[in-house]
Amino acid sequence: MKTLYSLRRFYHVETLFNGNLAVSGRDQETTGFAWWAGNARLINLSGKLLGAHVAHAGLIVFWAGAMNLFEVAHFVPEKPMYEQGLILLPHLATLGWGIGPGGEVVDTFPYFVSGVLHLISSAVLGFGGVYHALIGPETLEESFPFFGYVWKDKNKMTTILGIHLIILGLGAFLLVFKAVWFGGVYDTWAPGGGDVRKITNLTLNPGVIFGYLLKSPFGGEGWIVSVDNMEDIIGGHVWLGAICIFGGIWHILTKPFAWARRAFIWSGEAYLSYSLAAISMMGFIACCFVWFNNTAYPSEFYGPTGPEASQAQAFTFLVRDQRLGANVGSAQGPTGLGKYLMRSPTGEIIFGGETMRFWDLRAPWLEPLRGPNGLDLAKLKKDIQPWQERRSAEYMTHAPLGSLNSVGGVATEINAVNYVSPRSWLSTSHFVLGFFFFIAHLWHAGRARAAAAGFEKGIDRETEPVFFMNPLN
């Protein structure tokens, strides 16, 4: 749909200093936006906006493929992934590719294949992006009405929403298919110290799955982040996939109800703000998930969680001092509490000392030593296995601590130690990105609401310094 009049009165007017710099349909006069305002120039050019989005997808997939191959090229099988600064290979390993018992990498070829497939995909997307940005039709409405749209068309917008939901649902089911039929996924809780296995006994009980949503986010409750078995994770993806696909079909077949038409602002910038809010929330949830959860993010690949490293330290010194003759059940610490063991607020036996705050921790290397009332004193005296000692010593020395300059370890560490856990990187980056996306949501939501209310006039530029400068050329 060609616009026959200038859109300047509808947008902030950004003044272009060099008025001669113009590309057809993307200049200051026809769009009201200068070149540096990016995709805002394409608000009413659906064909060109398609090009921008496809090219953006190509950049994302190119990064994934290139970084994947970079990590494969630098990978050392003898060292754990988390010691090598890897953030992509742990995700592939969690999906069960190339992994044997105990999280050991037995084959790096699947990782290479993944990188190459992403690079090839990015080339296809890159070509499509360049084609639609430079050659394809400026608008899709005339030639391809199915792909065309007008931002104000509420029915079309919810149809597009429905298509997106169906694609998301299919993505959730891809994980289900991988876990149930195509080789399984890595389960850190598998007997004998973690292994790749097919998840056959899915949790489909809605009481269990939706019970996570009703839990408190604090302490030992932990909301959805507290999921601690693969059956619940894969079963949850069955539910999510089904809900997304059903919701997508619903949004395609129905028109928005009157209350929805009144409640929402129906403009491109409003949709941008809704998307930013959603992705901000996902960023915050991902931050908590990767920091606290050692089932979806196994410690074999991502390193221990903070609580896990702390509890591992207490366990390591309990083992050492017990060998030296200490009675760990009755030894008293400097505060009068138990030095090695104490009781939690609810009566369970837990590790004593500073790590008492992490008494909720569950980890595959520690659970065998628990009884009905917390840690079992008899098991601690007789049943500790060498693999548990090795695992806890390893995790104790790889706590997810680190600073901005990538010099890792605790403050007392020697300078030779340069270790920053992928958990630190992934949780910090997702928190920061989630925060920025939230600010962007507020910004664009405010602009969209102001524009809809009719008082979006832009900034008065009469006294702007640039007007009093000599031209660059």
UniProtKB/Swiss-Prot annotation:
The modification N-acetylthreonine is found at T15. It is found in: Plastid, Chloroplast thylakoid membrane. The keyword Cell cycle does not apply. GO terms for biological process: photosynthetic electron transport in photosystem II. InterPro entries: PS_antenna-like, PS_II_antenna-like_sf, PSII_PsbC, PSII_PsbC_sf. Its main location: plastid. Keywords: Acetylation, Chlorophyll, Chloroplast, Chromophore, Manganese, Membrane, Metal-binding, Phosphoprotein, Photosynthesis, Photosystem II, Plastid, Thylakoid, Transmembrane, Transmembrane helix. One of the components of the core complex of photosystem II (PSII). It binds chlorophyll and helps catalyze the primary light-induced photochemical processes of PSII. PSII is a light-driven water:plastoquinone oxidoreductase, using light energy to abstract electrons from H(2)O, generating O(2) and a proton gradient subsequently used for ATP formation. Belongs to the PsbB/PsbC family. PsbC subfamily. This is Photosystem II CP43 reaction center protein. It comes from Staurastrum punctulatum (Green alga).
